[in-house]
From Swiss-Prot:
UniProtKB keywords: Cobalamin biosynthesis, Glycosyltransferase, Transferase
Keyword Chaperone annotated: no
Protein name, as recorded: Nicotinate-nucleotide--dimethylbenzimidazole phosphoribosyltransferase
Catalytic reaction equation(s): 5,6-dimethylbenzimidazole + nicotinate beta-D-ribonucleotide = alpha-ribazole 5'-phosphate + nicotinate + H(+)
Record-annotated active site: E317
Family: Belongs to the CobT family.
GO molecular function (one): nicotinate-nucleotide-dimethylbenzimidazole phosphoribosyltransferase activity
Organism from which the protein derives: Herpetosiphon aurantiacus (strain ATCC 23779 / DSM 785 / 114-95)
CDD domains, A to Z: DMB-PRT_CobT
């Protein structure tokens, strides 16, 4: 894979479909713009899919899980063993994203990108893309090798193409990994040129001296790497295996004109990686929500994405993306099913 040529593999949004969707929105029985972000979203979806009206019938939530060496520094309120335990919980159907996926009628795919103890499961909705027993400690050394970073990214692209081939027309992103808000904070600090304190939150609930320690770790990692890095280098230095796979999924989905629902802080950090490698991929992204992590809003602003929801979520897993799936479907149905002024015999504005 030549990452220098990635943007050439992603088409611009379809201008004819966008124009058709805008014209139809303006003819529907409502004041122009009265449905706010739902109108904007429906037009974006038309441009992504080259269809007016667009349709989302087979959404899937993809949760990538991996461990992080930086967890040994006490940056999380939970031990690394929780990553594998939560993967088991996902597969058993007991996690928040499991419940929400059932609620919104979405399929759920769990990926082991690099859990400390490799997951063994025969579950139909599980796949192993194991890249190692977690990353190295990003505070003191590169989190992964160049080969691991490239493999993670390429695997993500391949997964997205397989999902598109299976008929999935919306890919929602989720993640699990103790220590991964620290990796996300480091990536956000580098890509957005922000100080550690501005992008580092409480994650799983670290408080007081542990929170200050987390800020120090992020600052230490960013200082080690420096700001003059591009391409895959930030992922190599301070990323995570799950973040690399998710970044690849974003690019692969964009190549196939499949819209992507970005979830919380970690998946948004993956979008920053994707943006650095293939800027046009972000045109295919929808921000499900803005969560409680301070770096999340900064990253969304860098990406130019406006969140659909603000619920103070800080769970990850794809929970916010799951909640946004019905909004995406609603945007499609409004454009498809609402009457026009002419068809409903309603007078237009004076």
């Amino acid at each position: 894979m030549n990452i220098d040529d990635l943007s050439a593999t992603i088409a611009e949004l379809d201008s004819a479909a966008i124009q058709q969707a805008q014209q139809r929105q303006d003819q529907l029985t409502k004041p122009q713009g009265a449905l706010g972000l739902l109108e904007t979203l429906s037009i974006q979806l038309a441009g992504i899919t080259q269809q007016c009206p667009p349709s989302v019938q087979k959404p899937i939530i993809v949760v990538a899980a991996a461990d992080h060496g930086v967890a040994e520094y006490g940056v999380s309120a939970y031990p690394s063993s929780v990553t594998a335990q939560m993967v088991a919980n996902f597969l058993a159907g007991g996690a928040a994203v499991s419940v929400l996926a059932r609620h919104v009628g979405a399929e759920l795919l769990i990926i082991d990108a690099g859990v400390q103890t490799a997951i063994v499961s025969e579950a139909a909705n599980f796949r192993s893309e194991w890249l190692g027993a977690g990353t190295h400690n990003l505070a003191i050394e590169p989190a992964m090798s160049q080969a691991q970073a490239q493999s993670a990214f390429e695997r993500g692209i391949r997964i997205a193409h397989e999902l598109a081939d299976a008929g999935h027309d919306l890919i929602a992103l989720g993640e699990m990994g103790i220590g991964n808000t620290t990796a996300a904070a480091c990536l956000t600090a580098i890509y957005c040129q922000q100080p550690a304190a501005a992008v580092t939150g409480h994650g799983t609930g670290v408080q007081a001296e542990h929170y200050q320690r987390k800020i120090e770790v992020v600052a230490q990692a960013v200082a080690r790497v420096g700001s003059n890095v591009d391409g895959l280098q930030p992922l190599i230095e301070v990323g995570g295996f799950e973040i690399g796979i998710l970044a690849g999924i974003i690019v692969g989905a964009a190549q196939r004109r499949v819209p992507i629902l970005v979830d919380g802080f970690i998946t948004t950090a993956a979008a920053l990686v994707a943006q650095a490698l293939a800027p046009k991929a972000i045109d295919y992204c929808i921000a499900a929500h803005c969560g409680a992590e301070p770096g999340h809003r900064i990253a969304l602003q860098q990406l130019g994405l406006r969140p659909l929801l603000e619920l103070d979520l800080r769970l990850g897993e794809g929970s916010g993306a799951a909640l946004a799936i019905p909004l995406v479907q609603a945007a499609c149905r409004i454009l498809s099913e609402m009457a026009t002024f002419a068809s409903a015999h309603v007078d237009t504005a004076l």
